[in-house]
């Protein structure tokens, strides 16, 4: 329940509303709103896990219903829901912001640097949080407080950015919402144009298939390595946690290549192929030849794939969608992606249970079937990439 609470509002339509707000109100308002939601959500979660919550009237009321689910978990889930809304809204706002500031310039490099910094941040938090939690006395409150502080710094940083963006609008002759007064404004009916675009659906389905084989895989990766290599959970986690760092190092370089040489659709195809190869190695090679060297090799391949696809995918959206509804286009892609990310872990969990009947706790799992399912997503994503390349050749979007 807690793990899925981050996606609940987004799957049930908040992301669509977020895109409309972004296109109607502009990047400054939406950015501050999204950063505020993340900070508020984290603050609620912090209160829910802190000692101040224990014995409070809120705890008494929350524990009076659905007694099998602790009151602290209920409040933390509420905070995580609010945080999740802000996080996804921030994602589409950052994408549209970079598209605005770097249109006609090094947009793919800028997006690559943004993704690289984000992945370094994820690595840092996953490294620092356990250390903070295990400091005497051990408590989960400390890392939550640390992350809440980071979100406050992020909110203040974006407020500073709004002054810079307002100055840019004056230089470009844009209105208060960052729009060109001579261009047609966003209308809610523009959502129909997005849904009616064939190339939008190709990109959206490629996105959901690719990321469904990345993020849900991360949930199972540690146990998969533990089962295949016969190592401890900590050792397996230490092997896999370097995956985002490899992607962070390569993504800006690929973004720069995309800006100067193109080949965006080709990069998507190769990224999907590499992901398929990685999951097939985990499905068949690693179980037959348990080796940390093979595991690291497959993770490096996945890291290159995770650089190729995002570096080419997100800068491609402004080329296929009009600027006035670009925010809604990003939000709808994120919305479709969130549906996949909500459902796919359950599919993999069922496949794992199906292929391991009568599994005894403490023994290794057979991950062949789940890895084949992940690889199948890569195959379909590759075919969609080929289709996208053909559409680009016909319609001249400029992806290549």
Predicted segments, located by residue:
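C-terminal ends and interior cores of transmembrane alpha-helices
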Residues: 36-68, 273-289
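C-terminal transmembrane helical hairpin of 12-TM major facilitator-type secondary transporters
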Residues: 264-313
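Cytoplasmic helix-loop-helix junction between adjacent transmembrane helices
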Residues: 73, 77-117
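Helix-loop-helix hairpin linking two adjacent transmembrane segments in secondary transporters
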Residues: 114-169
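Cytoplasmic membrane-interface "Motif A"-like loop-to-helix N-cap segments
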Residues: 23-35, 259-273
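Flexible cytoplasmic inter-helical loops of multi-pass small-molecule transporters
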Residues: 160-189, 395-400
